[in-house]
């Protein structure tokens, strides 16, 4: 009994340390955004600035075209998320409920794409966007990411957990394939679709490297690029204002994940139920 309690204490201590290490950058970012420049460069590490100042946020909102960059990022993230979610559901439905030649080969080929380093695809995608005339446009950022193999895999695993008699009963009642999908399956997998959509949105919102290659005009930049541009323009000296920009940039994905983490965790748990 004593050994069991000791093991539990060790695990709790380990988890507390892990949580602290993961949350500390966020706490530091928020704390720095509430400091003036003199407080930032103090020798003592003070995570709770006193008195806190919101002047950095006022400066950002008045002198930084934040709404433009938020719209650019939101527009790209919404389109990419909607496309990935729709194609994931439709492809998963085809893989689970249709029998066609080379079905397993196609699915296994899709799984192999997980093992291709993203850096290998950068140059071909860039050349393709160049030939299509999509450089320095939001469409050039969106196009290579409109389909997601991991989303298809997760939706396939979720659909395989739906009882077959339920679907057979719908078919016997005369339901067409699209009716089975939208009237029977979709109500059952809505939490999973919401979960992967949140993950897609957060990933697209935080995307940095690919937009950096595609976008040049300042008016087209996304928030991560705008943050980097701001830091470079200030010579790396206005850290308190930069952290205010970073905090505002981080709020949407943090809030989304906070409200939807239950659905996200359940989706990944369900993906392991059926092999």
Task: List where the protein language model places each region.
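A structural signal for multi-pass alpha-helical bundles of membrane permease subunits
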Residues: 2-275
């Amino acid at each position: 009994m004593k050994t069991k309690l000791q093991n539990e204490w060790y695990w709790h201590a380990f988890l507390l340390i892990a949580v602290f290490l993961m949350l500390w950058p966020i706490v530091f970012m928020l704390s720095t955004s509430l400091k003036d420049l003199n407080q930032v460069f103090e020798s003592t590490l003070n995570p709770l600035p006193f008195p806190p100042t919101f002047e950095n946020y006022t400066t950002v909102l008045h002198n930084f075209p934040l709404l433009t960059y938020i719209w650019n990022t939101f527009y790209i993230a919404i389109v990419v998320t909607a496309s990935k979610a729709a194609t994931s559901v439709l492809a998963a439905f085809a893989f689970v409920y249709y029998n066609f030649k080379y079905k397993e080969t196609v699915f296994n080929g899709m799984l192999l794409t997980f093992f291709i380093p993203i850096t290998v695809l950068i140059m071909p995608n860039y050349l393709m966007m160049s030939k299509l005339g999509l450089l320095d446009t939001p469409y050039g950022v969106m196009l290579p990411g409109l389909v997601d193999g991991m989303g298809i895999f997760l939706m396939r695993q979720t659909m395989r957990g739906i009882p077959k008699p339920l679907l057979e009963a719908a078919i016997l009642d005369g339901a067409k394939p699209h009716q089975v999908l939208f009237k029977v399956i979709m109500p059952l997998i809505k939490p999973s679709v919401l979960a992967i959509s949140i993950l897609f949105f957060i990933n697209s919102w935080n995307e940095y490297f690919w937009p950096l290659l595609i976008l040049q005009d300042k008016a087209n930049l996304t928030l991560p690029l705008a943050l980097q541009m701001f830091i470079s323009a200030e010579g790396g000296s206005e850290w308190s204002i930069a952290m205010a920009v970073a905090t505002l940039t981080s709020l949407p994905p943090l809030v989304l994940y906070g409200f939807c983490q239950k659905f996200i965790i359940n989706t990944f748990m369900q993906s392991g139920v059926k092999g």
